Amino acid sequence: MNIRKIAELAGVSVATVSRVFNHPERVLPETRERVLAVTREHNFTPNWFARGLTLGATKTIALLIPAIDSYFSQNIISGVETVAGNKGYVVLFCQTHGDQEVEFDFLKLMKTRKVDGIIQVQSQLSETDFHEPLSLNMPRVHIGKNQDCGCHMVCYLDYEEAAFRLVKHLLTLGHRYISLLYDDKRDGELADEMESGLKRAGREAQCEAHLSIFRAEDSAQGGYRAFQRMVQKGTIPDVLVTAGDLQAIGILKAARDGHISIPEDMALACFNDSPVCSVVSPAITSVEMPAAKLGMAAARLLFDSIEDDTRDPDILQEMILQPKLKIRESCGNKTGIFELFV
């Protein structure tokens, strides 16, 4: 069954059947119903991809994201899907694992799939990394500070401000030596932002703060193993700040197994707040990053560009979202208030 057969059985032209599918308001109600009755009788489904090519829009967008298993990533996905769903679009998810080659291959694939736009999350690419010509004549938004990937629309979370607020709190508790545990495949910008925030907090507090960097997989197992290595080497930090909540959970488990008390022996904080941070013991001081709002902001930027083809694609559009510090017990806070919002 195809569109020609439908036209023949309904006693109309192929053009009329096409209008029923693409512009039903232009077809007389009785004619429209006759065509639809034939499609129902023969269980005919239009080829929406071919229809999209004809109309110049496939009603699909792509989301290229390093990982889909973290609470942070899931919130970005939720935000993007909310906006896309309201627009009647389908989202194609592409997990890059922070790998440049994988990300580049997905870009090529999305070009052949004729998606209407692409959102890239924490892209590891720069245009100089394109080892073969790749002309992407479609709107693209990048979630992250990296503008070298060729996106002229960017939105990101202010990690430097998040680091400043967190370190400022740690300094008031008397901590001076801070260690950061992050996954360089997923959190490439975090180390530099942490260092900038730490220096600004130190200047404001008129004291010197020191930063050490450690790397581990962004998972509970990654945090557990990383802390075990620290214990074995006798390098337990004064304060350990993790990039992800799962790493922090793994560290809590490793500390308990090693009879190390938090916060008495070591303070613990994380950059990615999640519901679990408030229910473990001790509750983990963390930075709430509005990831769902970030996904929604990126999607809105993308659809504004899709719907307005008069916009100059070379003009940079930048949107920055601010963090919120949630002070709990894991860093030594002694106040009677369960949770502070700074």
Residue ranges and their predicted role:
Residues E41, T82-K87, K111, S135-H142, ...:
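Bacterial carbohydrate/catabolite-sensing allosteric modules
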